[in-house]
């Protein structure tokens, strides 16, 4: 139907402009096909007249000359036809190139319009502004995460209570060792001692025993001298 309406002037002007190169190329190709057929026909005539002239060159010179005349006419017509074919081919190529250029330009314009719609009112300044806001949001998120993970949730620990618990554990250890050696100390007489104080106490007791032995020896010597 669109083709019929086109013959009678129907259809939009834009559609006509779009179809104009195609119609021109179609008409040129039709004419080119006809000229190529004519080229083959003329070439056949030339070959045929050349054969007639060769056949009658010795027996019938008149017929040979007529054949050569027809051959010359066909060659002249063929030369003109070949020129027309070359011209049509050039025109077809020119129109096709122009049409391709137009379609390429139209595609580029459509791409530009699409990019314009995608970007809208977006500008490099707005992009920088949004990126800065995004960085601020990320920094705030990191600060919040740090505050949450570093917060000491619950009651604060009393260091004094920890020291009391440590002394109780040390006293229990001392009591356990005394129980193993058979000794006993009343609960109210127990003294909280440092874990490292036991060795020092034993050293002091040993030194005291040595001093007492020396004193006893000196006392015995004095008694012997008085007895004399």
Curated annotation (Swiss-Prot):
It is a peripheral membrane protein. It is found in: Cytoplasm; Endosome membrane. One of its GO terms (biological process) is vesicle budding from membrane. Gene3D superfamilies: ESAT-6-like. GO terms for cellular component: cytoplasmic side of plasma membrane; cytosol; ESCRT III complex; multivesicular body. Residues 25-94, 125-226 form a coiled coil. It holds the Pfam family Snf7. Keywords: Coiled coil, Cytoplasm, Endosome, Membrane. Its main location: cytoplasm. Required for the sorting and concentration of proteins resulting in the entry of these proteins into the invaginating vesicles of the multivesicular body (MVB). Also required for the proteolytic cleavage of the transcription factor pacc-1 in response to alkaline ambient pH. A component of the endosomal sorting required for transport complex III (ESCRT-III). Belongs to the SNF7 family. This is Vacuolar-sorting protein snf7.
């Amino acid at each position: 139907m669109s083709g019929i309406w086109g013959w009678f002037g129907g259809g939009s002007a834009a559609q006509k402009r779009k179809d104009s190169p195609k119609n021109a190329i179609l008409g040129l190709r039709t004419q080119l096909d006809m000229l190529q057929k004519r080229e083959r026909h003329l070439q056949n005539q030339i070959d045929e007249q050349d054969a007639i002239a060769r056949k009658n060159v010795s027996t019938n010179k008149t017929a040979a000359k007529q054949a050569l005349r027809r051959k010359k006419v066909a060659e002249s017509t063929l030369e003109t036809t070949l020129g027309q074919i070359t011209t049509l081919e050039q025109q077809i190529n020119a129109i096709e190139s122009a049409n391709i250029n137009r379609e390429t330009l139209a595609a580029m314009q459509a791409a530009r319009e699409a990019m314009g719609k995608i970007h809208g009112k977006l500008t490099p300044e707005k992009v920088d502004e949004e990126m800065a806001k995004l960085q601020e949001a990320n920094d705030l998120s990191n600060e919040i995460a740090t505050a949450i993970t570093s917060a000491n949730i619950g009651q604060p620990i009393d260091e004094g209570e920890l020291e009391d618990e440590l002394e109780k554990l040390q006293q229990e250890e001392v009591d356990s060792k005394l129980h193993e050696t058979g000794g006993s100390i009343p609960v109210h007489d127990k003294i909280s001692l440092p874990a490292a104080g036991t060795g020092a106490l034993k050293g002091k007791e040993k030194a005291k025993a040595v001093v007492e032995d020396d004193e006893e020896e000196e006392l015995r010597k004095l008694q012997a001298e008085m007895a004399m």
